[in-house]
Amino acid sequence: MNTAFAGFDENRAGRRAPGCTGRPAFGLGMDSQQDVVNLDQGGCCPALRKLLPRGFWDEARALFVLSGPLFLFQVLNFLTYVVGTVFCGHLGKVELASVTLGVAFVNVCGVSVGAGLSSACDTLMSQSFGSPNKKHVGVILQRGSLILLLCCLPCWALFLNTQHILLLFRQDPAVSRLTQDYAMIFIPGLPAIFLYSLLAKYLQNQGIVWPQVLSGVVGNCVNGVANYALVSVLNLGVRGSAYANTISQFVQAAFLFLHIVLKKLHLETWEGWSSQCLRDWGPFLSLAIPSMLMMCVEWWAYEIGSFLMGLLGVVDLSGQAIIYEVATVVYMIPMGLGMAVCVRVGTALGAADTLQAKRSAVSGLLCTAGTSLVVGTLLGLLNSQLGYIFTSDEEVIALVNQVLPIYIVFQLVEAVCCVFGGVLRGTGKQAFGAIVNAIMYYIVGLPLGIVLTFVVGMRIMGLWLGMLTCIFLAAVTFVVYAVQLDWKLAAEEAQKHAGLQQQQQQQQQQGAECTAPSPGPDKAVVSSVATGCNPGIALTMYSRPGCHVDFYGRPEAAPAPAAPASRLSVRQLLFRRGAALAASVAVLMAGLLVRVLTTGY
């Protein structure tokens, strides 16, 4: 079976030299007869080459080509929030605290939910794009859009009550009030950022990454100009920063959408809106909810850690803030590689190419380990100078210098977890990742960190030692799981996600018509030409690589399969989706009612 990887040279990565023999390559359950390193090859470091899978350098090149723009994309998203913080930081301590808390609240109660749910597309879109059924990618985009837009309503209910939630956690009343303003203004921006995330996933899982970077540049330019105009010129303060952020989110989403349409990047995977987007919400959510938990469990753990440091005093909180900012930027490097691994693994499994999927996973692990070693070395060289970038307070700088060696080891292990997270998303095993993260962070990491911080008296170092312990155990668990992973079963599940099993049933039914008793001479000619098959021979879905020839004479990419008759009727679908809409609206109305009843208290 031929496979197609958008923009990647598969043949070079998968080519084996005749008669290649030798010891098995280091890998995740790799076949010793297929994944071997030719020890007869020339070159230096023969001992090192024994650890590398065949085609490693080509695969590494493909991963870095993908992950480089994805890293820039993440940095640009991060800068969107930094710009607003910088502008409001010059207004005063209350304004700085308010915009910082506002961004954190919006991220935890809104953005993280959408980012997590949209991660289901990493599995479904990459696997569908790797299969002959590429049109199914468009159906997944439609389905994800509807589900994420519904999820906006419960998030809005939280935004409406931001002030009361913060006061429950004993935050400053003045800061809580301004944070409420920030969240309220950002309400219309949440659907924009959700759709932007989906469009980015839509392109990313086809191997298209530069439009996202370009949209991020445009969004940041608009954000900077808007912050200057609204915060510095019109003196709108925190509200101006919120307006600027909301505007930039709409600009980014609109720019990326127009780029897709005008550049016709959707032609291969989109054939219009379909009622299929109302189906299979269960399988989508079975991946989306674990994806969200896998991401949010880790995200929220660090936010809790920052909150705990605030209980110790300003010095520890400041030190935690500096380490956290460094960690956020450094994390984007393995995150980009993890995304690239997810795309490569998912696309390979969609094409039923388990060998390529394993090669991508192993190569991604080695690339991530190498980049993390480089980052760790740079941080070690900057050990005594890093704190001065953020502050001139000697006490805070000394604290940062104490914690930095722990973080250097931490980021290396975290990078391993990050790339295995990409493997889990590519194979559709997010539920396992969510369970491991929940156990390690909330049963091991945070409790151990709290004991070391408050009982033993290690303060901020205790927190990071607890985090290092949990991330190390998580990495070991992921490695053991990946080594035992059944790649053939993962490929079969990928065919289900891509809708190929339904399509095979259709093809068999339509192929049976092709084997029916031979029609009259005129009809026989039409049949053999229009269907692309000879009378008496049934077509298979792989009549041409990545292409489906329909039975009306239109060669085109494989369409999304029609639903079997045994599935829910349109009326049943509308009833169920209407019930989901009603439930989301009910949550929003409950939030609105709470806000009205508590106003003035």
Swiss-Prot record:
It catalyses: thiamine(out) + H(+)(in) = thiamine(in) + H(+)(out); estrone 3-sulfate(in) + H(+)(out) = estrone 3-sulfate(out) + H(+)(in); creatinine(in) + H(+)(out) = creatinine(out) + H(+)(in). It is a multi-pass membrane protein. Optimum pH is 6.0. It is found in: Cell membrane; Apical cell membrane. GO terms for biological process: organic cation transport; xenobiotic detoxification by transmembrane export across the plasma membrane. Residues 1-62, 117-145, 204-212, 263-281, 342-361, 424-437, 481-577 are cytoplasmic. The chain crosses the membrane at residues 63-83, 96-116, 146-166, 183-203, 213-233, 242-262, 282-301, 321-341, 362-382, 403-423, 438-458, 460-480, 578-598. Expressed in renal cortical tissues. Keywords: Antiport, Cell membrane, Membrane, Transmembrane, Transmembrane helix, Transport. Residues 84-95, 167-182, 234-241, 302-320, 383-402, 459, 599-601 are extracellular. It comes from the Eukaryota. Belongs to the multi antimicrobial extrusion (MATE) (TC 2.A.66.1) family. Multidrug efflux pump that functions as a H(+)/organic cation antiporter. Mediates the efflux of cationic compounds, such as the model cations, tetraethylammonium (TEA) and 1-methyl-4-phenylpyridinium (MPP+), the platinum-based drug oxaliplatin or weak bases that are positively charged at physiological pH, cimetidine or the antidiabetic drug metformin. Mediates the efflux of the endogenous compounds creatinine, thiamine and estrone-3-sulfate. Plays a physiological role in the excretion of drugs, toxins and endogenous metabolites through the kidney. This is Multidrug and toxin extrusion protein 2. It comes from Oryctolagus cuniculus.
